[in-house]
């Protein structure tokens, strides 16, 4: 029997409230569970102590028995210092696609050319501009 530590949704429509439960992976999300070990109320502010409550001793017990936490519960347990999450890395997924890479390369080349032109213009000896002549006085009528 594969066990998960997961969230079971309760509460009213648009007012979620979750129980942190130990359940068989084959049972429905909000269905039968083995034990309730905590609660999570996402409507409370993040700094509120009542937002997430977990019985740490029971969580340690179920983790030692082999229950696997879901991503969200793993985050809660990691914050409590009970469980360490594995680092997630998928650099290929976040990489820009082919057309976006072409656009980025073109923008980079244009920027380099502009920088080179500005540098060349700055290094060229500056020719003295002729002094502006004083404006002629207007004829008096």
UniProtKB/Swiss-Prot annotation:
Cellular component GO terms, alphabetical: cytoplasm; small ribosomal subunit
UniProt xrefs under InterPro entries: Ribosomal_bS16, Ribosomal_bS16_CS, Ribosomal_bS16_dom_sf
Low complexity compositional bias, start-end: 115-141
GO process terms (BP): translation
Molecular function via GO: structural constituent of ribosome
Disulfide bridge map: none
Pfam families named among the record's database cross-references: Ribosomal_S16 (PF00886)
Biased composition (Basic and acidic residues): 89-111
Keywords: Ribonucleoprotein, Ribosomal protein
Annotated segments matching region Disordered: 84-141
Tagged with keyword Ribonucleoprotein: yes
Family matches, as HAMAP family: Ribosomal_bS16 (MF_00385)
Similarity comment: Belongs to the bacterial ribosomal protein bS16 family.
Protein's UniProt name: Small ribosomal subunit protein bS16
Organism: Parvibaculum lavamentivorans (strain DS-1 / DSM 13023 / NCIMB 13966)
Phylogenetic placement of the source organism: Bacteria, Pseudomonadati, Pseudomonadota, Alphaproteobacteria, Hyphomicrobiales
């Amino acid at each position: 029997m594969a066990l998960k530590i997961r969230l079971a949704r309760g509460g009213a429509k648009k007012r979620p409230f979750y129980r942190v439960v130990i359940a068989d992976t084959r049972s429905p999300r909000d269905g039968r569970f083995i034990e309730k070990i905590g609660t999570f109320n996402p409507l409370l502010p993040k700094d509120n102590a009542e937002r997430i409550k977990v019985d740490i001793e029971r969580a340690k017990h179920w983790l030692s028995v082999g229950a696997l936490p879901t991503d969200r519960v793993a985050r809660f347990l990691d914050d409590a210092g009970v469980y360490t999450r594995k680092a997630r890395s998928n650099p290929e997924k976040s990489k820009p696609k082919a057309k976006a890479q072409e656009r980025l390369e073109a923008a980079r080349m244009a920027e380099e050319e502009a920088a080179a032109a500005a540098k060349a213009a700055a290094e060229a000896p500056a020719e003295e501009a002729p002094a502006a002549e004083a404006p002629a006085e207007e004829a008096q009528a």
